Swiss-Prot record:
Pathway: Purine metabolism; IMP biosynthesis via de novo pathway; 5-amino-1-(5-phospho-D-ribosyl)imidazole-4-carboxamide from 5-amino-1-(5-phospho-D-ribosyl)imidazole-4-carboxylate: step 1/2. It holds the Pfam family SAICAR_synt. It catalyses: 5-amino-1-(5-phospho-D-ribosyl)imidazole-4-carboxylate + L-aspartate + ATP = (2S)-2-[5-amino-1-(5-phospho-beta-D-ribosyl)imidazole-4-carboxamido]succinate + ADP + phosphate + 2 H(+). HAMAP family: SAICAR_synth. This is Phosphoribosylaminoimidazole-succinocarboxamide synthase. It is an enzyme of class 6 (ligase). One of its GO terms (molecular function) is ATP binding. The keyword Ligase applies. One of its GO terms (cellular component) is cytosol. Keywords: ATP-binding, Ligase, Nucleotide-binding, Purine biosynthesis. Its EC number is 6.3.2.6.
Length: 238
């Protein structure tokens, strides 16, 4: 697979075209950011950890019948993925209250949410990724009703798989965000699943093992990511 031009550079990943028009190479960088890019830092090993963590999770999801853009890892920091026409919203499921929902609704962090909540957010850093609903998505033509329904179904299917996976590793899946896109008429899970895009707590101590360590200046960010992987039986190459 020949790596060609850089197509896009985000806050923590770069995407490149290849000699196959249906495939892209996704490079996970060590760059880390929070608060819509206002806080930034490069953390050694993070790109490699997130790439390999994402690969392991995507394989678990594919095995559970969830369609994903992930194809295979190419190196410690690169993966081959299908080229999706991305739907410009994030799907967020919350099993436990933390982060923005606590500020918006005045609820205490740690409140168990039964059933889990589901929210859509528009992907737009300049606007602060505002929360939107099905009607916004329909009115602005971001996705069809059928695509919205599929995104919801797949997002909760991911929850069923990963809640138990992390629980088996002694962790609570607090919340997470997913992105989807279209590939030849099919809705596929895109982007990544790593501790950058979810909240994970130790089941007993409730120690934070995710990007909140960076947001809140707790330190040990990559070490926490590695600990999560270790609990799930992952090994990392650098």
């Amino acid at each position: 697979m020949e790596k060609r031009d850089e197509l896009y550079a985000g806050k923590a990943k770069s995407v490149y075209t290849t000699d196959d028009e249906d495939m892209l190479i996704m490079l996970f960088r060590d760059d880390t950011s929070a608060f819509d890019g206002k806080k930034k830092e490069a953390l050694a090993r993070k790109g490699a950890v997130n790439n390999q963590f994402n690969a392991a999770i995507m394989e678990k999801l594919k095995a559970a019948g969830i369609p994903c853009h992930f194809e295979k890892t190419l190196s410690a920091t690169e993966s081959l993925v299908k080229k999706l026409d991305m739907i410009p919203v994030e799907c967020v499921v919350r099993n436990i209250a933390a982060g923005s929902i606590c500020r918006r609704l005045g609820v205490e962090e740690g409140l168990e949410l039964t059933p889990p909540t589901f929210e859509f957010f528009l992907k737009d850093d300049d606007l602060g990724d505002p929360m939107v609903n099905d009607f916004h998505i329909r009115s602005f033509g971001w996705a069809s009703d059928d695509q919205v329904a599929q995104m919801k179904t797949l997002t909760f299917a991911v929850n069923d798989v990963l809640k138990q996976l992390f629980l088996d590793g002694g962790m609570l899946l607090v919340d997470y965000k997913l992105e989807f896109g279209m590939f030849k008429g099919e809705v596929l899970l895109g982007d990544e699943f790593s501790p950058d895009g979810c909240r994970l707590w130790d089941k007993d101590s409730r120690e934070k093992l995710d990007k909140d360590r960076f947001r809140q200046g707790l330190g040990g960010v990559v070490e926490a990511y590695e600990e999560v992987g270790k609990r799930l039986g992952m090994t990392f190459e650098y």
